A protein has these predicted regions:
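Conserved, well-structured interaction surfaces
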Residues: 46, 50-54, 58-64, 87-160, ...
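Structural register within alpha-helical repeat arrays
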Residues: 142, 149, 214, 221, ...
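An aromatic- and glycine-enriched ligand-binding surface/loop that stacks and positions planar moieties
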Residues: 26-87, 194-195, 211-360, 484
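Flexible, polar/acidic helix-loop-strand segments at domain edges
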Residues: 94-98, 321-401
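Bacterial N-terminal signal peptides
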Residues: 11-21
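Long, intrinsically disordered, low-complexity segments
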Residues: 25, 57, 65, 81-88, ...
Length: 524
């Protein structure tokens, strides 16, 4: 059985479920429950502070975020995914085709989930000074909370741009905030992550695997600086991770997506899920309650023989180097990322047929064929019948070392070091189970910076496609002017860089437009 933080369940009775609107009442009836604990009465020792910190992780693995809607929102805002067929729900299809509205429930769930994370982090940070029995643990828990708050604001600013910033628990409507400029949000992100990196440990024992580490904070700092196009600053954080020697690439690329190989040497931060043995799912969406031990819907949603709501896009599939297009070798990562009709699954005991797969076909090198996701879907060990209902506990690898090497390659190229950029790219290609020819190649020359930009775009899609990176890659490269034609066919400049602010936020937060920034993003 897995042993780590998600085995600890805490009923967050007193935590706000988000940024709430308070209402007044004229009655003077005293309804106080003498057994009810407030934050002031609860936080008396480090065990209670740790329980509150665990509640943040519980929200992270809830359906609003990593268990369901987070991966959908990222993937549907990219060009690596396509609709599996008519079974893709309307709210998800709207995002895929660029028809998002302020009432879209997928988008709103992610917004609410991120602010729920922020609220829970603020509870921990605000009440930590009351805890005096174990200062070193207290400070580490505050570091974990700041890491998670920094991550949440990074997600918010990436999707919505200017957003309200809260660094304390909201107790009345007068504390609502207007939208802060993107630079201010990034400053909040960087401040939190720097504080976290200063106190978080490099590793944990098995009982605490899944908690934020120094390496995770450094990786997020690098990401934040990259999105601001500050590649020198980003490079310094990635260099520290590389120099630490804490991480290395797994020999087997597919080990990054299997349940049996979680927390391997490549993993820097994972969102933890639990296989409860009954294929049940917590549809509560907030990670609370008696069923808070959380499985993930990823394998159910993307599995070729389950719901198959999404499939790999033709753009993604045809990005891989292949002998049919003149490459000296077909990239093995294609076979380790997707299932094609005719492939075997269930430990080689079953063969995937077209009629097992509901919905659309793909076009790979001119051939029309049904293809589905292999990453995270667990079909490698499941029979066809078992895969019909598959809510399991496969952890999501939010940060892995290959990303750090590819990030470093981009930073080196952007700061004029083409040779170093190629070195980091080739480290990724030299993984023993991949073993692709080193750059430059005949198909991918490296005579100048823009040649290497093309290599980076290609290699990031091959290595990280379907892992929720591409959305931010597109945002970054679009801002740098690197696209002759935008990867998203619906893209309208001045509108589709950002998602619409949820209508519930506009209706419930009267301060949203009180500053210099309009309450809604342009075009919505």
């Amino acid at each position: 059985m897995k042993r780590y933080i998600s085995n600890i369940t805490w009923v967050t009775t007193f935590l706000l479920a988000g940024i709430i609107v308070l209402s007044s009442c004229d009655t003077e009836l005293d309804l106080t429950d003498p057994s009810y604990q407030t934050p002031e009465s609860y936080f008396q020792n480090s065990d209670e502070l740790k329980a509150a910190t665990n509640a943040i992780y519980s929200q992270l693995s809830a359906a609003q975020l990593f268990a369901r809607e987070w991966f959908f929102l990222h993937d549907l805002r990219s060009d690596v995914i396509a609709a599996g067929g008519g079974q893709l729900e309307a709210s998800r299809r709207q995002i895929l085709i660029g028809a998002s509205s302020p009432t879209n429930n997928v988008m709103n769930d992610v917004w609410n989930g991120l602010y729920n994370v922020i609220n829970r982090t603020n509870v921990v940070i605000q009440n930590a000074p009351n805890v005096e029995d174990n200062p070193s643990l207290r400070d580490r828990l505050v570091g974990e909370a700041k890491f998670l708050r920094g991550w949440a604001y990074y997600e918010l600013v990436s999707f919505w741009g200017p957003v309200p910033i809260y660094t304390s628990v909201i107790s009345n409507p007068e504390q609502f905030q207007p939208r802060s400029p993107e630079d201010s949000v990034y400053a909040r992100v960087i401040n939190d992550l720097e504080d976290a990196a200063a106190v978080l440990p490099e590793t944990y024992d098995d009982a605490d695997r899944g908690r934020a580490t120094w390496g995770a904070a450094k990786a997020m700092l690098g990401r934040a600086h990259m999105q601001q196009l500050d590649f020198e600053a980003a490079k310094s954080h990635f260099q520290e991770i590389i120099d630490s020697g804490l991480y290395s690439l797994t020999d087997n690329y597919f080990d990054n997506f299997k349940e049996e190989t979680e927390f391997n040497q490549e993993s820097i931060f994972e969102v933890v899920f639990i296989d409860k043995g009954d294929d049940s799912f917590n549809w509560d969406y907030t990670g609370d309650g008696a069923n808070a031990a959380q499985s993930t819907a990823r394998a159910q949603e993307y599995n070729p023989v389950a719901w198959r709501n999404t499939i790999p896009s033709d753009t993604y599939l045809n990005n891989f180097e292949h002998t049919e297009t003149g490459a000296p070798k077909t990239d093995p990562r294609l076979e380790m990322s997707v299932y094609k009709t005719g492939d075997t699954f269930n430990g080689g005991q079953s063969t995937l047929t077209s009629d097992m797969q509901n919905g659309n076909s793909s076009t790979l090198h001119g051939e029309e064929i049904k293809i589905g996701w292999r990453k995270y879907t667990l079909l490698y060990k499941l029979s066809f019948d078992q895969a019909q209902n598959v809510f399991r506990g496969n952890n999501h690898r939010m940060i892995r070392y290959a990303e750090i090497l590819l990030n470093m390659a981009e930073c080196e190229n952007e700061t004029g070091n083409i040779g170093q950029a190629l070195n980091y790219l080739n480290q990724v290609r030299n993984r023993s189970s991949v073993d692709m020819p080193e750059y430059p190649t005949a198909q991918y020359p490296a005579a100048n910076k823009m040649d290497v930009v093309e290599i980076i775009m290609h290699e990031r899609m091959a290595e990280l496609g379907g892992e929720e990176y591409r959305n931010r890659d597109i945002l970054r490269w679009r801002e740098l002017g690197y696209f002759d034609e935008d990867p998203l066919p619906y893209f309208q400049e001045g509108r589709d860089e950002l998602l619409p602010i949820p209508s519930t936020e506009i209706n419930n937060n009267p301060e949203l437009g009180s500053g210099s920034i309009n309450p809604q993003n342009p075009g919505y």
